[in-house]
Amino acid sequence: MSVISMKQLLEAGVHFGHQTRRWNPKMKPYIFTERNGIHVIDLQKTVKLVDDAYNYVKNASQEGAVVLFVGTKKQAAEAVKEEALRAGQYYVNHRWLGGMLTNWNTIQTRVTRLKEINKMEEEGTFEVLPKKEVVLLNKERERLEKFIGGIADMPRIPDVMYIVDPHAEQIAVKEAKTLGIPVVAMVDTNADPEPIDVVIPANDDAIRAVKLITAKMADAIIEGRQGEDAADDFVAEEAASEESLEELAEIVEGK
C-alpha cells in the first residue's frame, strides 16, 4: 500500500504544473496532460515515486543518516523548518549561501561565532556590556541565525538532501553533486530532473503541496529511526491509489 493517496495529492494541488511555455522537456515522462495552458502532472507516477522516496529516506534514516531539508522560497520555508525539526534533522530555509557545503570549514567558523554569542548571553555577559554593543551582538546573531541557524548543530556534511524546487535551489544541487550527496527533491514541470537522484514530480509552488510531501519525508525519517508505528503517516487505501487516468482527467477538467 502507498504512503500517500491520489485524493491527498489532488486536494493539495500537487498535480498543477507550470505554464506549458515554461516547461522543461525532460519532465515529459511525468506529465499527464495539458489543461488551459497548464501542464498537469501524472499523479499515478507521483504516488509511486513518493513511495520510492519514502523508502529511500527511511532506509537512510535506519542507517543513521544526517538529512538536510532545503527550501528557501516563501511557499516552502515554514514547512521545511517545521518538518526538519519534527524529524530531528536540519534545514536551510532562508537563502543558500554559496559554499555552504563545499566550504564547510568556513561555514563552521560562522557557526562557532553564533554559538559564542549565545553563550555570552547565557553566561550573563550581555548584562555587563554597553547597551550599544549588546544591540550589535543581537543583530549579528539574528543574521547568523537566519542563514545558518538550521545547520548550527548539524554534526557533519549531510548524507542525504531533500530539496523543494531544485530549479530555485540550483546552487545547493550543484554542491550536493560535487560532494556526492544524494538528492531527493520535489520537481515541478519547469525543472531539470536529471541531477536529482530521487525525483518526486509535484507542484512545488503551493504551500499545501509542499507541506504534504515534506511531511511524508519527515515521517520516513521518524519511521526509520523509531519503527513503523512512530511516524504519524497516512497509509493510502489500495483503491485510492488505483484511480485510473480517466478519473484523474475528469477531476482535472472539473477544476
Curated annotation (Swiss-Prot):
What are the protein's UniProt keywords? Answer: Ribonucleoprotein, Ribosomal protein
Q: Which InterPro entries match?
A: Ribosomal_uS2, Ribosomal_uS2_bac/mit/plastid, Ribosomal_uS2_CS, Ribosomal_uS2_flav_dom_sf
Matching entries from Pfam families are given as: Ribosomal_S2 (PF00318)
Q: Name one GO biological process term.
A: translation
- Does the UniProt entry include the keyword Ribosomal protein? yes
TM regions (residue ranges): none
The cross-references to PANTHER family, in alphabetical order and at most eight, read: 30S RIBOSOMAL PROTEIN S2 PROKARYOTIC AND ORGANELLAR (PTHR12534), SMALL RIBOSOMAL SUBUNIT PROTEIN US2M (PTHR12534:SF0)
Q: Which family does it belong to?
A: Belongs to the universal ribosomal protein uS2 family.
The protein's matches in NCBIfam families, at most eight in alphabetical order, are given as:
rpsB_bact
Q: What is this protein called?
A: Small ribosomal subunit protein uS2
* Annotated organism of origin: Lactococcus lactis subsp. lactis (strain IL1403) (Streptococcus lactis)
